[in-house]
C-alpha cells in the first residue's frame, strides 16, 4: 500500500498527463485503492498489477493540484482564468464548457487516437506560451490605473490553497471569512480556537464578486464556521442542498474505439460485469477519496428524515469491512428501511439498512466512477439468458484478472455501460468468438431453431479457455518444472531435509552450481523489488520467500494461510517449510523458474518402523548419518510422485546403507518385496491416496485370551452393556500417543486428497472436539454425503464431512486398534433397556479409575469382562454393586447375558456421547440439621425447586480442601492427551480456575458446543470455561461433601404455569447473589427444603409468602388438607371427622375476625356458624 506520507505528498504533486503518441514500456507502479489504514476487506477485490504497460489510448485526468502547482512554477504569472481562484476547474450540472485554449488543465477524460485540442500531448512546461505572454503584458500595465483592461482581464488574486492548519493542499474554505483554506473539516476544527479571533464575515463586494463567476466555473466547496458555535464545532454545508446524482459526477468521456485497461472486479454474466480502471490518476483519486470519506464520516450519525432516492449517489457503509464507499441507490424499501446500493468504484452491490446510507458531501471531489459496467459485444445468449455453466466458465477466466478491452459502443442506461471487445490473454481469442464456439452464445440476428449444445470439439480447440486454463497466464507460467526420476536411476545427492525415513528430500549434486546461481539471481531480484503490502498469493502459488534463519530469499510454494497476515510456505528446492509473514514474500518472475524444483521427495526403501511408527530417536539416527552429506541415491521404485530410494554412504569403507543402519539400531525392521511393491505402484504422477485401485489394508484389534486379567481404563461408555476400554499392557497408551502425533503431522502436511469413503474401510478422520486426527473406520454413509465414523482407538462414533477424511497409510495400521468394545458379564437390564440410573451408577463406579478386567468371553462383537475396583480398601466388583443396588439383574450364564444384552443400543440413554463422569445423583453436598437457621449467599437459581447456596460461615474443612486441591492438580496434569471431555448439565467435574490455573471441584450449570459454565462447588465462584479446561473427576475425590448446599424453596408452593418466567425473575431479583437467611425444614436426597427470608427496610421478608401475595404461587396447605379430607371415608364412629369439621369452622371465624372486624351482619353469621 502507499505509505501515508507518500499519499499526502501525492496530493501536492503535479501528475504529468499521459503521452498518447509515446508508447510506454511499463505502466506506473500499482498502488492499492485504499488508505494505508488496516482495511483488507474491500467491497470487492484488490486491483491487480497488469502484465503489460499502457501502449496507447490511455486517459488523462484533471486535478485541482495541477493548476495550483502550475501557477507556482513562475511567481510572476497571474492566471487569466478566474476559475482557478478556488483551485478547481470543472462544469456545473448541465452547463459544462471546455476551458480556454492554452490552459493545461482539462476535465477528466479518457484519451483516444485524436486527443482534444485544448490538451497538449507533449507539454514542455507547465505554463503555455500564450499564458506566459499574456501575463507579461498584464504586468507591463500593472501601474496604469486608468487602463480598463486591468479590471476586464484580471480575475481575483490567486490565493494560496494550502491548509492553514497542516500546510497540505486544501480546497475547503471558511465560508464566513472566505480567506482561510483547509484540507479537511478535521483541520478546521483544530484550528478554530485561533482562527475564530480573526474570522470576520466576508464583505458584500466579495460576495458580489463571487456571484459573478464565469458559468463554467464549479463553485468551491466551503466549510462554514459559525461564530456562535463553540470552539472546535464546525458545520459543513454544500453548495446547494440538492442531492448528488450520477450525472453530477465528472465524466469519463469514453468514446468508441477507445482502449481501456483494468481489473474485472465483479462478474455476473457476460452481459454484466465491471472493470475497475487502472492508472496512476485513478489510484491517487481513490486514495484521496478513501481518506476523505474516512475523515468526513468517521463519527457521523444518521440524519433524521433522510431518505435516499433511486439514482442518487450517496455514501454507504460496506457490510463486510464497515468502510464508507460511494454508491448509487438502485432501489429503496421504505417499509423495511433498506436500500439496494451499487458501489460505483467496485461494481458489487448489496442490500443495507437506510441508517448505513448518508448523502454524499459536496465537500468531496466528484471524481468519476472508478468501475465501469461492461458487456461483451457481438454475442447474445443462445437460450435467451446465460446458462450457469457459461457463467462459471467465463467467470473463472475473467474474475480478478487484469485485461484490456476495446470500447465498441456506449449504452445509455441507469449507469454508463460499455459494449466491449475483450481478448482472453490465456488463448489470444476474442471472448465473443469463444462463447459462440462453445455453444453458449450466438451472433446477433442469427436464427437457431433448436438450442445449440456445447461443442466438445470446440472445447478441445480452446483447451486453454476452460476453467483450468485461466492458470496458464498467471499460474502455470509461474510453476517450476519437476525433475523426473526413473527406476534404476543412480546419482550423487545430498539429503536436504528429513521428516521421517518415509518422508525426506534429496537434491542432485550435479545441479548444485545452478542452484547457487539461482540463489544469486533471487537475492539480486528481491533486493531491487519494492515490498508490496497488497501481495496476497493463493494456495499453491510459487513466490519468493525470505527464510527466517538467514534472511536469504528462496523459491517457495504457499501451502496454507495461517492467519490474515501469515502463510505456511514450503521451500521447493530444499523441502523444509515454515510460517512467514506476508511481508517476507514477493512475487516471482518466470526467469527464476527455469531451473526445475530441486527437492526430490523420497521414501527410504527396505525398512519399516519396528514400533509401528517412526520415533524421534529413529529420525535422529538417520539425520546423523545422511543429512547434509553427499550420498549415493539409487531409485528402486516409485510411490506416486515420491521416489523409493536406497541411500548409501560411499565415503567410508565399508559402505554404509541407511536402511541397514536403522535395522541394526533396532528402530526399523526389514520390509520384504520392496522393489516389487514400488514398481507395481509406478503409475501416473498422481497422489498416492487416489491413484489406481485402493491398496488392500490390513488391521487388527487388541488380542486377549479367556480368563486373562489385565488393567483397563474405560474411555467411552454408553451403558453397562456397551463401553470401550483401553487395555494397559505393553505400553499401549504410550505407543498410541506417539502414533496419534505422527498421524496428526502426516494429515497436517497433506491437503484433502479426494478420499472415497467405503463402509468398513479404515481412514484418518478429523475429530472436531479437539481438532486432531485419529484412526477411524467408516461406519455409515449418510444421504447428505456426510460420513459416520467409528474412532477405533476410543470407541466414540461421530459424523464428519468428506473433507475431514484422508486415506491412511499402512504403517499407521500396524499398531492394533486400542478401543476394545466390552460389556459387563453376569448382569442384564431389568427390562429390555438399560436405565439411566444404572448407566449413571456404572459411570460413577468407573470414571477416571484404573480397573482390573477379567476376560470372561470373546465374540465378534467384543469382549465380556468382569470389572473390579482395587482402589478401595477391599476389592469391589462393579457388577455386584449394580446388583446390590437393584439397578440390574443377575443372569444365569455368559450366554444368557449375551442374549439379553442389547447390542449397540446408543439410543437407550442418549444419542450423544456419555462420558464417564459423576452425574448429579452421585455427588453430595454438606447437609445441615433440620430446623437449623443459617446465613447464606445464593449462588445460582435453576428453578424454585433447585438453587445453590453457600453458608456465610467459613467451613471447617479448609485443610482437607487444600489437600484435595493438591491431589486434583496432580490427577488432572496426568490426564493430558486424553480425548475431549464433554460434561452434561448437573455433572460434577474438575475445572481449571482462570485466575490461578489450579484445578477445583465444580458442578456443570450450562453447556454449549465450545464452552461450559461451572460453579466451583467448594468456594461458590461461577465462570464460563472452554472445554479444554474441564476434566472428569474420579469418585475418590467426591468423598468429601461439596461445601455448597442444594436447596429447594419450602414445600407449600405451586407455580402457575403462565407465571413461571415472572417467578424466576422475581426470585433472581430477590435472592441471586444476595445474603439471605435459610431455615432448613426437611432434607430429601441431599436437597434441603428451606424457607428463605431476606432483610429489608420493613423487616424480614419471606420469599415464598411474597410469591403468594403477588399471585405467582399459592399455599398448598389448605388444598392438601381438603384433598385429604375427601379421601377419608365418612364414618359416624370416627371422631376425626367431627374434629376436622370443628377446626375448619374455627379457621373461618378467625379469618373473618382478621378481615372483617367491623362488619355486624357477617358477625351474626359467624355466631350462627359457631353454634351449629
Swiss-Prot record:
Residues 75-86, 103-117 have a biased composition (Low complexity). The keyword Transferase does not apply. It is found in: Cytoplasm. The keyword Cytoplasm applies. One of its GO terms (cellular component) is cytoplasm. Keywords: Cytoplasm, Developmental protein, Differentiation, Meiosis, Metal-binding, Repeat, RNA-mediated gene silencing, Spermatogenesis, Zinc, Zinc-finger. Testis and ovary specific. Present in germ-line cells and is most abundant in fetal prospermatogonia and postnatal primary spermatocytes (at protein level). The gene is Tdrd1. Zn(2+) 2 binds at residues 174, 177, 195, 199. Found in a mRNP complex, at least composed of TDRD1, TDRD6, TDRD7 and DDX4. Interacts with MAEL. Interacts with PIWIL1, PIWIL2 and PIWIL4 (when methylated on arginine residues). Interacts with TDRD12. Residues 1-59, 72-136 are annotated as: Disordered. A zinc finger (MYND-type) spans 163-199. The lineage of its organism: Eukaryota, Metazoa, Chordata, Craniata, Vertebrata. Zn(2+) 1 binds at residues 163, 166, 183, 187. This is Tudor domain-containing protein 1. Plays a central role during spermatogenesis by participating in the repression transposable elements and preventing their mobilization, which is essential for the germline integrity. Acts via the piRNA metabolic process, which mediates the repression of transposable elements during meiosis by forming complexes composed of piRNAs and Piwi proteins and governs the methylation and subsequent repression of transposons. Required for the localization of Piwi proteins to the meiotic nuage. GO terms for biological process: germ cell development; meiotic cell cycle; piRNA processing; spermatogenesis; transposable element silencing by piRNA-mediated DNA methylation.
Amino acid at each position: 500500500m502507499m505509505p501515508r506520507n507518500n499519499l499526502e505528498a501525492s496530493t501536492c504533486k503535479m501528475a504529468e498527463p499521459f503521452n498518447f503518441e509515446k508508447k510506454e514500456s511499463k505502466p506506473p507502479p500499482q498502488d492499492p485503492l485504499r488508505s494505508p489504514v488496516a482495511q483488507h476487506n474491500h467491497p470487492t477485490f484488490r486491483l491487480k498489477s497488469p502484465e503489460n504497460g499502457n501502449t496507447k489510448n490511455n486517459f488523462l485526468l484533471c486535478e485541482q493540484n495541477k493548476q495550483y502547482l502550475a501557477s507556482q512554477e513562475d511567481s510572476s504569472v497571474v492566471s487569466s482564468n478566474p476559475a482557478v481562484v478556488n483551485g478547481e476547474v470543472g462544469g456545473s450540472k448541465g452547463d459544462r464548457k471546455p476551458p480556454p485554449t492554452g490552459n493545461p488543465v482539462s476535465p477528466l477524460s479518457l484519451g483516444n487516437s485524436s486527443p482534444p485540442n485544448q490538451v497538449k500531448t507533449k507539454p514542455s512546461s507547465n505554463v503555455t506560451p500564450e499564458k506566459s505572454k499574456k501575463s507579461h503584458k498584464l504586468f507591463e500595465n500593472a501601474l496604469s490605473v486608468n487602463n480598463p483592461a486591468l479590471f476586464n482581464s484580471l480575475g481575483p488574486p490567486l490565493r494560496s490553497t494550502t491548509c492553514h492548519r497542516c500546510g497540505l493542499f486544501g480546497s475547503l474554505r471558511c465560508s464566513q471569512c472566505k480567506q482561510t483554506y483547509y484540507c479537511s473539516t478535521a483541520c478546521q476544527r483544530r484550528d478554530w480556537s485561533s482562527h475564530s479571533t480573526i474570522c470576520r464575515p466576508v464583505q458584500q463586494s466579495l460576495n458580489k464578486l463571487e456571484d459573478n463567476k464565469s458559468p463554467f466555473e464549479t463553485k468551491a466547496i466551503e466549510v462554514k464556521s459559525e461564530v456562535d458555535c463553540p470552539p472546535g464545532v464546525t458545520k459543513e454545508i454544500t453548495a446547494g442542498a440538492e442531492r448528488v446524482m450520477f450525472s453530477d459526477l465528472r465524466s469519463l468521456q469514453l468514446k468508441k474505439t477507445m482502449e481501456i485497461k483494468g481489473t474485472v472486479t465483479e462478474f455476473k454474466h457476460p452481459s454484466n460485469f465491471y472493470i475497475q480502471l487502472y492508472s496512476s490518476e485513478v489510484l491517487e483519486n481513490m486514495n484521496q477519496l478513501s481518506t476523505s470519506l474516512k475523515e468526513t464520516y468517521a463519527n457521523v450519525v444518521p440524519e433524521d428524515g433522510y431518505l435516499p432516492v433511486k439514482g442518487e449517489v450517496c455514501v454507504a457503509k460496506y457490510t463486510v469491512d464497515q468502510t464508507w464507499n460511494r454508491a448509487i441507490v438502485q432501489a429503496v424499501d421504505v417499509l423495511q428501511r433498506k436500500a439496494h446500493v451499487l458501489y460505483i468504484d467496485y461494481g458489487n452491490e448489496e442490500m443495507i439498512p437506510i441508517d448505513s446510507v448518508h448523502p454524499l458531501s459536496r465537500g468531496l471531489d466528484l471524481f468519476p466512477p472508478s468501475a465501469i459496467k461492461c458487456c461483451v459485444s457481438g454475442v447474445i445468449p443462445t437460450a435467451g439468458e446465460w446458462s450457469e455453466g457459461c457463467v462459471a466458465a467465463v467467470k473463472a477466466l475473467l474474475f480478478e484478472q487484469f485485461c484490456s478491452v476495446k470500447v465498441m459502443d456506449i449504452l445509455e442506461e441507469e449507469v454508463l455501460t460499455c459494449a466491449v471487445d475483450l481478448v482472453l490473454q490465456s488463448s489470444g481469442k476474442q471472448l465473443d468468438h469463444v462463447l459462440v464456439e462453445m455453444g453458449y452464445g450466438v451472433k446477433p440476428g442469427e436464427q437457431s431453431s433448436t438450442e445449440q449444445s456445447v461443442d466438445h470439439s470446440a472445447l478441445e480447440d480452446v483447451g486453454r479457455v476452460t476453467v483450468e486454463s485461466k492458470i496458464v497466464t498467471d499460474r502455470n507460467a509461474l510453476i517450476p518444472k519437476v525433475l523426473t526420476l526413473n527406476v534404476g536411476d543412480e546419482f550423487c545427492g545430498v539429503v536436504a531435509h528429513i521428516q521421517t525415513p518415509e518422508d525426506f528430500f534429496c537434491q542432485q549434486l550435479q545441479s548444485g552450481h545452478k542452484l547457487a546461481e539461482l540463489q544469486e539471481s533471487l537475492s539480486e531480484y528481491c533486493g531491487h523489488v519494492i515490498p508490496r503490502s497488497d501481495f496476497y498469493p493463493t494456495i499453491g502459488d510459487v513466490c519468493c520467500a525470505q527464510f527466517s534463519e538467514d534472511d536469504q530469499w528462496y523459491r517457495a510454494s504457499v501451502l496454507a494461510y495461517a492467519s490474515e497476515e501469515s502463510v505456511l510456505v514450503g521451500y521447493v528446492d530444499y523441502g523444509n517449510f515454515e510460517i512467514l509473514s506476508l511481508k517476507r514474500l514477493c512475487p516471482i518472475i518466470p526467469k527464476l523458474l527455469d531451473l526445475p524444483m530441486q527437492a526430490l521427495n523420497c521414501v527410504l526403501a527396505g525398512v519399516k518402523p519396528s514400533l509401528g511408527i517412526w520415533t524421534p530417536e529413529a529420525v535422529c539416527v538417520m539425520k546423523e548419518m545422511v543429512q547434509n552429506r553427499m550420498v549415493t541415491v539409487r531409485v528402486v521404485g516409485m510411490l506416486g510422485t515420491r521416489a523409493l530410494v536406497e541411500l548409501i554412504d560411499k565415503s567410508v569403507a565399508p559402505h554404509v546403507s541407511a536402511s541397514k543402519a536403522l535395522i541394526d539400531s533396532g528402530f526399523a525392521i526389514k520390509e520384504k518385496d520392496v522393489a516389487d511393491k514400488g514398481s507395481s505402484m509406478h503409475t501416473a504422477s498422481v497422489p498416492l491416496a487416489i491413484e489406481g485401485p485402493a491398496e488392500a489394508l490390513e488391521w487388527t484389534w487388541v488380542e486377549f485370551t479367556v480368563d486373562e486379567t489385565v488393567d483397563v481404563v474405560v474411555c467411552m461408555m454408553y451403558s453397562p452393556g456397551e463401553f470401550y476400554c483401553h487395555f494397559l499392557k505393553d505400553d499401549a497408551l504410550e505407543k498410541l500417543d506417539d502414533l496419534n502425533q505422527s498421524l496428526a503431522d502426516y494429515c497436517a502436511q497433506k491437503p484433502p486428497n479426494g478420499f472415497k469413503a467405503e463402509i468398513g474401510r479404515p481412514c484418518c478422520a478429523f475429530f472436531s472436539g479437539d481438532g486432531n486426527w485419529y484412526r477411524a473406520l467408516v461406519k455409515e454413509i449418510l444421504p447428505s454425503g456426510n460420513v459416520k465414523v467409528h474412532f477405533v482407538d476410543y470407541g466414540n462414533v461421530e459424523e464428519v464431512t468428506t473433507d475431514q477424511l484422508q486415506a491412511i497409510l499402512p504403517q499407521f495400521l500396524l499398531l492394533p486398534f486400542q478401543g476394545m468394545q466390552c460389556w459387563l458379564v453376569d448382569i442384564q437390564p431389568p427390562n429390555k433397556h438399560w436405565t439411566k440410573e444404572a448407566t449413571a451408577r456404572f459411570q460413577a463406579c468407573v470414571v477416571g479409575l484404573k480397573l482390573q478386567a477379567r476376560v470372561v468371553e470373546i465374540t465378534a462383537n467384543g469382549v465380556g469382562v468382569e470389572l473390579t475396583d482395587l482402589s478401595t480398601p477391599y476389592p469391589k466388583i462393579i457388577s455386584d454393586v449394580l446388583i446390590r443396588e437393584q439397578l440390574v439383574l443377575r443372569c444365569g450364564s455368559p450366554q444368557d447375558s449375551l442374549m439379553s444384552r442389547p447390542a449397540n443400543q446408543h439410543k437407550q440413554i442418549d444419542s450423544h456421547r456419555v462420558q464417564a463422569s459423576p452425574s448429579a445423583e452421585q455427588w453430595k453436598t454438606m447437609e445441615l440439621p433440620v430446623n437449623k437457621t443459617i446465613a447464606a449467599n445464593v449462588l445460582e437459581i435453576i428453578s424454585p425447586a433447585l438453587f445453590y447456596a453457600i453458608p456465610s460461615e467459613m467451613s471447617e474443612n479448609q485443610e482437607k480442601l487444600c489437600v484435595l486441591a493438591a491431589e486434583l492438580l496432580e490427577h488432572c496434569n496426568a490426564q493430558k492427551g486424553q480425548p475431549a471431555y464433554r460434561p452434561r448439565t448437573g455433572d460434577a467435574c474438575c475445572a481449571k480456575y482462570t485466575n490461578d490455573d489450579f484445578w477445583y471441584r465444580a458442578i456443570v450449570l450450562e453447556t454449549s458446543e465450545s464452552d461450559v459454565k461451572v460453579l466451583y462447588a467448594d468456594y461458590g465462584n461461577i465462570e464460563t470455561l472452554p472445554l479444554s479446561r474441564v476434566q472428569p473427576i474420579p469418585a475418590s475425590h467426591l468423598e468429601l461433601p461439596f461445601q455448597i448446599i442444594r436447596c429447594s424453596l419450602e414445600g407449600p408452593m405451586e407455580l402457575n404455569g403462565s407465571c413461571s418466567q415472572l417467578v424466576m425473575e422475581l426470585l433472581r431479583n430477590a435472592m441471586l447473589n444476595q445474603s439471605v437467611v435459610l431455615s432448613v425444614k426437611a432434607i430429601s436426597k441431599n436437597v434441603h427444603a428451606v424457607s428463605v427470608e431476606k432483610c429489608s427496610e420493613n423487616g424480614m421478608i419471606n420469599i415464598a409468602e411474597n410469591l403468594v401475595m403477588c399471585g405467582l404461587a399459592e399455599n398448598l396447605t389448605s388444598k392438601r388438607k381438603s384433598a385429604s379430607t375427601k379421601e377419608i371415608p365418612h364414618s359416624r364412629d370416627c371422631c376425626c371427622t367431627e374434629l376436622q369439621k370443628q377446626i375448619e369452622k374455627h379457621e373461618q371465624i378467625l379469618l373473618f375476625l382478621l378481615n372483617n372486624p367491623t362488619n355486624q351482619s357477617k358477625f351474626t353469621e359467624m355466631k350462627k356458624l359457631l353454634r351449629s
